[in-house]
């Protein structure tokens, strides 16, 4: 059976992983695709 401490650790690790996944998705999405024209 899963104890309260194990459940808390699992949920915290899962939350951090999902948060970092969202941050990485936004970072990759914002920095790819549209090339920025260079100012002369």
From Swiss-Prot:
GO terms for cellular component: oligosaccharyltransferase complex. Residues 26-40 are cytoplasmic. It comes from the Eukaryota. It is a single-pass type III membrane protein. InterPro entries: Oligosaccaryltransferase (IPR018943), OST4 (IPR051307), Ost4p_sf (IPR036330). The chain crosses the membrane at residues 5-25. Residues 1-4 are lumenal. The keyword Transmembrane applies. The keyword Transferase does not apply. Disulfide bonds: none annotated. Keywords: Endoplasmic reticulum, Membrane, Signal-anchor, Transmembrane, Transmembrane helix. It is found in: Endoplasmic reticulum membrane. Subunit of the oligosaccharyl transferase (OST) complex that catalyzes the initial transfer of a defined glycan (Glc(3)Man(9)GlcNAc(2) in eukaryotes) from the lipid carrier dolichol-pyrophosphate to an asparagine residue within an Asn-X-Ser/Thr consensus motif in nascent polypeptide chains, the first step in protein N-glycosylation. N-glycosylation occurs cotranslationally and the complex associates with the Sec61 complex at the channel-forming translocon complex that mediates protein translocation across the endoplasmic reticulum (ER). All subunits are required for a maximal enzyme activity. Component of the oligosaccharyltransferase (OST) complex. Belongs to the OST4 family. This is Dolichyl-diphosphooligosaccharide--protein glycosyltransferase subunit 4. It comes from Drosophila ananassae (Fruit fly).
């Amino acid at each position: 059976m899963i104890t309260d401490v194990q459940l808390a650790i699992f949920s915290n690790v899962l939350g951090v992983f999902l948060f970092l996944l969202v941050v990485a998705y936004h970072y990759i999405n914002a920095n790819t695709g549209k090339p920025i024209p260079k100012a002369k």
